[in-house]
Amino acid sequence: MPDSTASATTRRTSERLLPRGLGDLVFQISLWLGFVLVYRLAWGIADHGGAVTPVARENARHVIAFENHVNALFEQSLQKVLLSSRLLVDLAAATYWLSQFVVLGFALLWVYFRQTESFTRFRNWLMLANVIGLVGFVLIPTAPPRMFPNLGFLDIEALFSGLTASSKGVGAFANPYAAMPSLHAADALIVGISMALVCRRLWAKVLWCLWPPWIWFTVMATGNHFWLDCLAGVLVTLAAAPIVDARFRFWRRNKPAQPKTVVVRD
């Protein structure tokens, strides 16, 4: 009896620490590392030894022209709001980098370990949206507003923190011409919705609902995206959601039934 009790306790502890087992955790990490590798390869193919730069700048000029045409080139106004407070500047600059690494990573790990039944849909939604975004980067490389100081746009991060997409340790993960669509905007919406749904406390749900609009403000006010980039990111998110849901429903319908466990008592 003591051996069986100890075994059951060990099993419950293992399930709590690794709800899907060590093999699945290694698989999930490998999956994301593989995506980063594909991202880097696709970026290298699209760059063509630097030839993408003039194309990206021209595409950005088209974005500026469109926003001007509809009288909605308001990113500079957001920058003025940001510059009204040094605290706001520091928060926005930190948010821009932490959102795609620390916050996104935390959300994935939290759902994986604490709400594991929701993880697959969350992961697939993120990955599909990022794959669509990656195709967008390759087909429509677009420069961010900060690369047009002649038009009055500021590179807030370079001015106040010195950290830019070309900084050491950052350049390996940042594509300076990946403004369209904004994956910051897309990922923030996915994370915000997913975390708001799985969190139980009201204050946590409210904070996660506020996460997407804060990110949208941040990426525009720091000069990293136009609002049209953010809109494209939101549309990518909305396009990916029904595909993921359809795949999830198909998987649930075709999932093999779990064998029932019969307990025989003496």
Predicted regions and their residues:
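Short, intrinsically disordered terminal tails adjacent to the first/last structured region
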Residues: 1-13, 253-266
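N-terminal transmembrane-helix/juxtamembrane module of multi-pass inner/ER membrane proteins
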Residues: 2-102
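Alpha-helical transmembrane segments of integral membrane proteins
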Residues: 19, 23, 27, 31, ...
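Aromatic-anchored segments of alpha-helical transmembrane domains
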Residues: 37, 41, 130-138, 210-220
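Membrane-interface loops
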Residues: 50-61, 112-204, 251-265
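Hydrophobic alpha-helical transmembrane segments
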Residues: 94-109, 184-192
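Interfacial helix-loop-helix junctions of multi-pass membrane proteins
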Residues: 144-149, 175-179, 214-240
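Hydrophobic transmembrane alpha-helices
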Residues: 192-196, 237-245
